[in-house]
Amino acid sequence: MSIIKTNSEILNQLLYGQDLDAETSNTLMKRWLNDEILEVQTGAFLSALRAKGATGTELSSMADVLLNACKLPVERPNLFMVDTCGTGGDGANTFNISTAVAFVASSCGVNIAKHGNKSASGKVGSADVLLNLGINLNSTLEKVISSIDQIGITFLFAPVWHKSLIKLAPLRKALGIRTVFNQLGPLVNPLRPNAQVLGVASDELLNPMASALSRMEMDRAIVVHGYGGLDEASLEGDNKIIFVDKGELKHSKINVSDFNYQNTSNKDLIVSNDDSYEDILKSVLNGSGQKAHLDVVALNTALVLWVAGIEDDIEKGFKKALFSMSKAEPWNKFLLLKNYLES
């Protein structure tokens, strides 16, 4: 028979650097959702978890609680879905690469269920840029779900689906540090995608995030930490990769030079004061963007095509994505989504 631990006992365990088992992690998250943890304790828990480092067991167990609390208003479409949501937080001020990748991958035949939020930092988040380009983030939940069946892509705005976490936002902002909830964000897509490409801003997050995805029975996934600290695959050098395939984890590296493409500096991806996140995203989707922008989106799209089982060769996936952008197919996909969610 398991022993139910008090909040103080769990906190002490974390302060001593001891990992939580699945049951205790589950209990902790349920107490957060049920308002059974004082605000001062929440600050201590989040700080202690950050200092210790969350494990795959802790992350997957907490994510399960959040997913079970998030009920779909209609049945999940019987489709193989992929998410491109990452942890963010690289501080590089690049354009919205994973958002662009979602539309390019969808134009290449992948059913994309993109989970995302507004930015908590100075950078424009996926929800910010889509909202500014006219995507209706307040469409009915039923319409958001049916969109992936009708259009091949949808966007799930996190606060709409995980209302129970909104109450923690002021404290998280006051703490001023990245917490376990930044890691949980990519793991709690309400549509429970079959596969995912998940970018992390620190190589210390590679193993726990891959372990969490494996424990959550993700069919296929890639966790990537980009060269130079990007939370996307970079064009500049070696990118650290963990392939998750039916529970098996395989460490690898990928570099565009492997298929005879020239390395390009991460600086070419930075949004300057004269640039607009929205204009850059539009130019990428319609194929008129800068070469570095198109190439980095193509590289990351190739990873999505791999997890989706559409293209097992990264170089071929890279070229497939470039071709789709050259035909403005991702922009057409964007317009379809915009019109569908408006109607």
From Swiss-Prot:
Pathway, per record: Amino-acid biosynthesis; L-tryptophan biosynthesis; L-tryptophan from chorismate: step 2/5
Gene Ontology annotations of biological process type: L-tryptophan biosynthetic process
Catalytic activity: N-(5-phospho-beta-D-ribosyl)anthranilate + diphosphate = 5-phospho-alpha-D-ribose 1-diphosphate + anthranilate
Superkingdom in the source lineage: Bacteria
Binding site for 5-phospho-alpha-D-ribose 1-diphosphate: 86, 89-90, 94, 96-99, 114-122, 126
Cofactor(s) recorded in Swiss-Prot or TrEMBL: Mg(2+)
Function: Catalyzes the transfer of the phosphoribosyl group of 5-phosphorylribose-1-pyrophosphate (PRPP) to anthranilate to yield N-(5'-phosphoribosyl)-anthranilate (PRA).
Quaternary structure and partners: Homodimer.
Name of the molecule in the record: Anthranilate phosphoribosyltransferase
Source species of the chain: Prochlorococcus marinus subsp. pastoris (strain CCMP1986 / NIES-2087 / MED4)
